């Protein structure tokens, strides 16, 4: 199966959400192939469908002072952080071709990063029975929060590569108070090559989901999004 992959650089959360919603509709109508957006966001907190405002630990004025935006999202989960140095993936995938199981879909995203971390970085990551995501010990390195509409997915994952982890101190990530967060930069003590990691994400996601990836440029993406 083909998977279009679009790398967008850094993009505001609302702009990415608007693009996802357009692609979701097109995929539901079978007017486009499965597609994954890979990008980074400026410092942003997003609130999922199980949001609890008590998990934001500082006043909104302090968030503004630090240049952190807040958005309400229709993904699953509570509050999470996105920012530069974090690879965010938004797969718009028709689950009719992938077992029509939300649980299996999340499991495969987790498997993507478990394999990537083991084979590329010799890190043994795992799942947690209580929480979604990918963990190294008690620290989360990949957050997962999805939405599914008429069996087409949106939202997705956030992989901490060179993320500013201090911004996670503004929240209880995903409402979790007894665990931490980590990144490749923290583990190895130096920034990682983002382009290299982007390629790894594409490779392992495609392998786990049995996709043939095709990288598309901005022109192609705009042509796709323009289909109404």
Swiss-Prot record:
GO CC terms, sorted: cytoplasm
Protein name as annotated: Octanoyltransferase
Source species, domain of life: Bacteria
Sequence positions that bind substrate: 75-82, 143-145, 156-158
Main localization (coarse): cytoplasm
Keywords: Acyltransferase, Cytoplasm, Transferase
Single Gene Ontology BP annotation: protein modification process
Xref: InterPro entries: aa-tRNA-synth_II/BPL/LPL (IPR045864), BPL_LPL_catalytic (IPR004143), Octanoyltransferase (IPR000544), Octanoyltransferase_CS (IPR020605)
Transferase as UniProt keyword: yes
Miscellaneous: In the reaction, the free carboxyl group of octanoic acid is attached via an amide linkage to the epsilon-amino group of a specific lysine residue of lipoyl domains of lipoate-dependent enzymes.
């Amino acid at each position: 199966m083909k998977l279009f992959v679009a790398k967008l650089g850094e993009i505001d959360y609302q702009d990415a959400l608007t693009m996802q919603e357009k692609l979701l509709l097109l995929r539901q109508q079978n007017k486009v192939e499965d597609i994954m957006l890979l990008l980074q966001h400026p410092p942003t907190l997003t609130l999922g469908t199980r949001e609890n405002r008590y998990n934001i630990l500082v006043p909104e004025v302090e968030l503004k002072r630090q240049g952190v935006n807040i958005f309400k999202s229709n993904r699953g989960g509570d509050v999470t952080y996105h920012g530069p140095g974090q690879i965010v993936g938004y797969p718009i995938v028709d689950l009719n071709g992938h077992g029509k199981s939300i649980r299996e879909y999340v499991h495969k995203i987790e498997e993507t990063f478990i394999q990537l971390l083991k084979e590329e970085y010799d890190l043994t990551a795992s799942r947690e029975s209580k929480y979604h995501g990918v963990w190294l010990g008690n620290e989360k390195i990949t957050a997962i929060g999805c939405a599914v509409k008429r069996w087409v997915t949106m939202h997705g994952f956030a992989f901490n590569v060179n993320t500013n982890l201090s911004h996670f101190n503004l929240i209880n990530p995903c409402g979790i108070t007894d665990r931490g967060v980590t990144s490749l930069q923290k583990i190895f003590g130096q920034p990682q090559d983002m382009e290299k990691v982007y390629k790894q994400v594409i490779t392992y996601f495609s392998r786990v989901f049995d996709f043939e990836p095709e990288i598309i440029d901005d022109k192609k993406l705009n042509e796709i999004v323009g289909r109404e």
